[in-house]
Amino acid sequence: MKIELVFIPLPGIGHLRPTVKLAKQLIGSENRLSITIIIIPSRFDAGDASACIASLTTLSQDDRLHYESISVAKQPPTSDPDPVPAQVYIEKQKTKVRDAVAARIVDPTRKLAGFVVDMFCSSMIDVANEFGVPCYMVYTSNATFLGTMLHVQQMYDQKKYDVSELENSVTELEFPSLTRPYPVKCLPHILTSKEWLPLSLAQARCFRKMKGILVNTVAELEPHALKMFNINGDDLPQVYPVGPVLHLENGNDDDEKQSEILRWLDEQPSKSVVFLCFGSLGGFTEEQTRETAVALDRSGQRFLWCLRHASPNIKTDRPRDYTNLEEVLPEGFLERTLDRGKVIGWAPQVAVLEKPAIGGFVTHCGWNSILESLWFGVPMVTWPLYAEQKVNAFEMVEELGLAVEIRKYLKGDLFAGEMETVTAEDIERAIRRVMEQDSDVRNNVKEMAEKCHFALMDGGSSKAALEKFIQDVIENMD
């Protein structure tokens, strides 16, 4: 009899890819395991995510990995600056998810063993309970921020403090998942905002009800944060550090622009190019664009810069390419840097990071981007823009010595609609530091890359955690 798990990912590219990759790793580790991935369509036109969903549902090559799409009424584009949060949208799909699962498990050769839900789909634990099976969670960020969220919720429920009342304060707080005090003003908007905090608290309470949490991290990368879950015993779910879960496929090999970028990198000396890329939601204002260009000009470094125009509201609209770079870049910049740099709209990040020419990575600190950089042994400059990225940056710089900060305590959050402009001086300084060839940061990253690779091998910590999860799933079946 097949053991069936139901996966419910969030329909965003940064969540879909690691979830599907994890599902493939699981069925590759246990022959009796079968997985159905419930695809909930994106609320709006999600670009890459929609394309990813389409490719997944048409290219499934393993009969033990099944994709089941549910139908959702397409919502028209909205001008509402604060659309319905993802968690609320997902919760509204419970009935359709329940029906899809019920239709799937009529097969007598399959026994439903549990749900594995995305961190933003935690409300689906209610559906798992209806089927009488355990609910596990995939946490696509890191153990440090997972611990931060749970601690904020615990302090609130125990009436010790309300973190939203400390907004804009210089107060530092102790978090069990961090070794150093953390400045409250650098917590994400979802925790410090009176409007968003209740949703985050409800989410954290739901996390605590999970049977276990699969975290996209490595035991050797976050030993202190993971210790928090070990010493709390029954108060917190079992955590399985199974990372790095990475999507390392290199996209469309026939794309001429992509091929040109990669050919150019092949022509550059080893570790000579600084790569600037800020994720699917990262865009720059004209002022920030000019400051960055001045920094690159003065630094003298070779560079590959993914530049897009900031969206007026990233909750509803993605950044777009600049139509005329010469209008926003300093006069003569493109001509002066023609032989040592490229300004592009988009790049295949993984394919770029694995090139020997890349010597440093200026990143928005999305967790997937951090893991990719560590995997390829590329030291980072942290330039956090939104969500938990300031916590990620703090961990990389202050806790682990794996990155250089663009500047200390960067103000603003793209989700809140405002970001501090970083000066050319700060950017140039950070770029020069990260490109140093024998720095402690570079050596630390090289060592961590080796640990990340070994973690996924036989005898490695992440491989062992994955096997432990499978064992627990089987033991938790009725």
Curated annotation (Swiss-Prot):
Keywords: Glycosyltransferase, Transferase. Transmembrane segments: none annotated. Its EC number is 2.4.1.-. One of its GO terms (molecular function) is quercetin 3-O-glucosyltransferase activity. InterPro entries: UDP-glycosyltransf_plant, UDP_glucos_trans, UDP_glycos_trans_CS. UDP-alpha-D-glucose binds at residues 280, 347-349, 364-372, 386-389. It comes from the Eukaryota. Coiled coil: none annotated. Belongs to the UDP-glycosyltransferase family. Possesses low quercetin 3-O-glucosyltransferase activity in vitro. This is UDP-glycosyltransferase 71B5. The lineage of its organism: Eukaryota, Viridiplantae, Streptophyta, Embryophyta, Tracheophyta.
